[in-house]
């Protein structure tokens, strides 16, 4: 429920604060005082596009701030609203209320705030649109649109779950159809790609490269290319360390020399020399190890150049792969892994195509059944809704009016991308909201031809149709009880007894909802629980909002009664109208 609204520098309103209660609140005022700015402010809180031209002349920005409570709402609605607050980081005030604010800058971007936290306008509307239902003359025009008519019928029918199930199946069906078409169109391309991948993997598997093999080959080839030089260097070094095989010269080797030196030092009684003997012994150990390693190195060296030729041939094989698939062998192996994964995804078999065709057919059947189920729900609800709206119109001084709702299957051409064959044999167009075309019909006098609402209702008649529809939706609990319903001059083009009946219907609606109405009709204003008047407060044309007392209400109603003003007859007429309305039992 909206408990307070503060407007600053919006249109004709300089600064105004209005407090709202449960029940029926009416706003009146002379033309040009800014009554509609109150509704405009609520539209802004509902996420409407910010218009800098709405900022009052001389001001830098306009601000609209609303305070909402959720105590009168059902648990499910409160839980949904709390989820919006939590996701936005918004907080409630100490009394549990929530402040929503919209700021419009003359030169910069607009700002939105919810519970003290800056939020996108979409997040703000996600909260306020659950609490506010706004209706104006533009909304009457929207009621002529087929999608709005279908939406109203679905609300009455409580068709939300059926619509969601249909949409889920439709998305799956469209995805499967796209996959099937893509599969058929790309079958040859996929087969060619699979052949290329198989050829490449076979080539790689035949060569059988090992991780890092190309790097190791470079080192091996470099070593084998200098085989004679390496053998000579190793042989010379070994001979120098251990001596030549000639027994007469064997004592010239480093091993023998170090052995003799160590023995000489060990034979001494001098401690220093014996310490040096240990160092020479360590050197001897190192030299002996080096001699052994040089021997092993020489044993491993190929006896001829055939080993080099084998390494070069292997390098040529690997280079064939690195020229085609990657810069090095490790990259080739990664490419092969990716190719195997891709090949596993490429199902080019006839079995795969047939399975996809079966799945698409199954989804089409399920979707067709869901569409029929949704149509059945709508057709049943259409009869009840049309009957109840016609009854409301009768109570609004339109006893001969007839309101109808047509629900027909929207047929499709064979070339339509969303054509769906139904069990009945019809080829329907599977739109986002079903296969149904919903059309509201209206005739002011029974016996005449019923025409589409857009072609048959005048402004005043359209106002009453819309009000009747809202009353039916609200009283059948398709609108959450405790929410706020705002009507901006939907009584345009209406007067007399019809205006009285509109007032009565709005008062009845206020039993379960907070109802706020901007009106120029005294018959409607007389039924309100609270009467607010928008009036000019200064010479600069600024306007404010004032709550009227009982006597003030009489004076305002007298003004609204054809400008009778402060005349005795005007006041008497206004007082009688007010007393009659307030004492109406609203049966």
Swiss-Prot record:
Pfam families named among the record's database cross-references: SMC_N
Coiled-coil zones: none
Claim: Acetylation is one of the keywords in the record: no
Entries under SUPFAM superfamilies matching the protein: P-loop containing nucleoside triphosphate hydrolases
Keywords: ATP-binding, DNA damage, DNA repair, Nucleotide-binding
CDD domains (UniProt xref): ABC_RecN
Keyword ATP-binding recorded: yes
Function: May be involved in recombinational repair of damaged DNA.
Family recorded in the similarity comment: Belongs to the RecN family.
PANTHER family, per database record: DNA REPAIR PROTEIN RECN
Name used for this protein in its record: DNA repair protein RecN
Name of the gene encoding the protein in the UniProt record: recN
């Amino acid at each position: 429920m909206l408990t307070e609204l503060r407007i600053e520098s919006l249109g004709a309103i300089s600064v105004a604060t209005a407090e709202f209660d449960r029940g029926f609140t009416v706003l009146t005022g002379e033309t040009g005082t800014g009554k509609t700015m109150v509704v405009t402010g609520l539209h802004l809180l509902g996420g409407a596009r910010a218009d800098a031209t709405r900022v009052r002349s001389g001001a830098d920005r306009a601000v609209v701030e609303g305070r909402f409570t959720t105590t009168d709402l059902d648990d499910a609605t409160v839980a949904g609203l709390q989820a919006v607050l939590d996701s936005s980081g918004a907080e409630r005030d100490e009394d549990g209320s929530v402040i929503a604010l919209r700021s419009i800058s003359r030169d910069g971007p607009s700002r939105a705030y919810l519970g003290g936290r800056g939020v996108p306008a979409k997040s703000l509307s996600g909260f306020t649109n659950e609490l506010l239902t706004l209706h104006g003359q533009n909304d009457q025009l929207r009621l002529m649109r087929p999608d709005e008519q279908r939406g109203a019928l679905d609300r009455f029918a409580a068709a939300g779950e059926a619509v969601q199930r249909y949409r889920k199946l439709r998305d799956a069906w469209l995805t499967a159809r796209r996959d099937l078409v893509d599969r058929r169109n790309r079958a040859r391309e996929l087969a060619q790609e699979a052949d290329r991948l198989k050829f490449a993997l076979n080539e790689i598997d035949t060569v059988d490269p090992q991780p890092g093999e190309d790097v190791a080959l470079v080192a091996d080839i470099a070593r084998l290319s200098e085989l004679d030089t390496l053998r000579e260097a190793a042989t010379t070094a070994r001979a120098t360390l251990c001596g030549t095989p000639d027994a007469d010269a064997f004592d010239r080797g480093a091993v023998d020399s170090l052995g003799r030196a160590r023995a000489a030092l060990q034979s001494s009684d001098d401690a220093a020399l014996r310490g040096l003997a240990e160092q020479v012994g360590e050197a001897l150990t190192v030299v002996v190890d080096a001699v052994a390693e040089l021997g092993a190195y020489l044993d491993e060296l190929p006896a001829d150049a055939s080993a080099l030729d084998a390494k070069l041939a292997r390098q040529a094989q690997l280079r064939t792969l690195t020229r085609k698939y990657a810069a090095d062998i490790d990259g080739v192996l990664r490419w092969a892994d990716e190719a195997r994964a891709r090949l596993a995804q490429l199902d080019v078999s006839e079995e795969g195509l047939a399975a996809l065709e079966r799945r698409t057919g199954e989804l089409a059947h399920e979707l067709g059944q869901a569409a029929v189920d949704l149509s059945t729900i709508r057709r049943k609800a259409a009869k009840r809704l049309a009957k109840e709206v016609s009854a409301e119109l009768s109570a609004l001084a339109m006893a001969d009016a007839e309101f109808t709702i047509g629900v027909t299957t929207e047929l499709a051409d064979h070339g339509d991308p969303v054509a769906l064959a139904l069990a009945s044999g019809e080829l329907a167009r599977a739109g986002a909201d079903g296969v149904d075309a919903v059309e509201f019909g209206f005739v002011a006098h029974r016996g005449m031809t019923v025409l589409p609402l857009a072609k048959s209702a005048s402004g005043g008649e359209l106002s009453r149709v819309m009000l009747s529809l809202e009353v039916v939706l609200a009283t059948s609990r398709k609108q959450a009880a405790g929410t706020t319903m705002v009507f901006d001059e939907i009584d345009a083009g209406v007067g007399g007894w019809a205006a009285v009946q509109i007032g009565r219907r709005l008062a009845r609606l206020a039993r379960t909802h907070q109802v706020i109405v901007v009106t120029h009709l005294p018959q409607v204003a007389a039924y309100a629980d609270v009467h607010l008047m928008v009036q000019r407060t200064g010479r600069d044309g600024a306007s404010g909002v004032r709550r009227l007392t009982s006597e003030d209400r009489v004076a305002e109603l007298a003004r609204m009664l054809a400008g009778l003003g402060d005349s005795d007859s005007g006041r008497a007429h206004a007082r009688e109208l007010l007393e009659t309305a307030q004492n109406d039992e609203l049966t």
